[in-house]
């Protein structure tokens, strides 16, 4: 009787191992690759993932939202709306943008809740056009048109606000001369 129960247990374990350890992961991976190839592979661009915000150095690049200071940490600073430290941080960021000739917008001054938001508002992108165009020695209207071409509408036409993916915009910017 002991050997019969042991045998049944091993057979059930082997069946579930094959189903849940091999068949299910292979099926979901195959379906993901077939139907959502780019998303299943991390939505990668030439220089990173379009789903993760990056810091770009230099006036020749469009800047995304600021991170909380530690790029490996995903999360906000946890400073409240009455925090003097938060207000001082916003003032410093706004002053730094103004020194570069960029009119500060809320999403260029305030970090996102996750700290890795890859998108900015169209207003934030347009605010940087003059600076980027001057740094790249390209006419403003060409950079403006590039931004306009990279404005994505709300998801499914009604969820969220229009946005610009900074990685996609900067990758397109490399081809603009």
Question: What does each model-found stretch correspond to?
Answer:
Residues 7, 31-32, 170:
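Short, well-ordered alpha-helical packing segments
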Residues 9-27:
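Hydrophobic membrane-insertion alpha-helices, especially the h-region
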Residues 14, 58, 162-165:
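Basic, gly/Ser/Thr/Pro-rich low-complexity segments located predominantly at protein N termini
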Residues 21, 26-28, 32-128, 135, ...:
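Flexible, solvent-exposed loop/hinge segments and secondary-structure transition points
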């Amino acid at each position: 009787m002991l050997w019969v129960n042991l045998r049944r247990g091993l057979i059930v374990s082997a069946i579930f191992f094959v189903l849940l350890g091999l068949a299910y992961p292979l099926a979901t991976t195959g379906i993901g690759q077939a139907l959502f190839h780019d998303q299943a592979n991390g939505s990668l661009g030439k220089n990173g993932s379009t789903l993760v915000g990056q810091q770009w150095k230099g006036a020749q690049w469009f800047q995304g939202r600021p991170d909380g200071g530690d790029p490996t940490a995903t999360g906000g600073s946890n400073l409240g709306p009455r925090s003097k430290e938060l207000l001082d941080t916003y003032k410093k960021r706004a002053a730094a943008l103004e020194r570069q000739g960029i009119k500060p917008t809320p999403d260029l001054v305030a970090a996102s809740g996750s700290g890795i938001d890859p998108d900015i508002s169209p207003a934030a992108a347009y605010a940087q056009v003059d600076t980027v165009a001057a740094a790249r020695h390209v006419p403003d209207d060409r950079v403006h048109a590039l931004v306009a071409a990279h404005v994505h509408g709300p998801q499914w036409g009604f969820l969220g606000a229009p946005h610009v993916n900074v990685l996609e915009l900067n990758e397109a910017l490399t081809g603009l001369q």
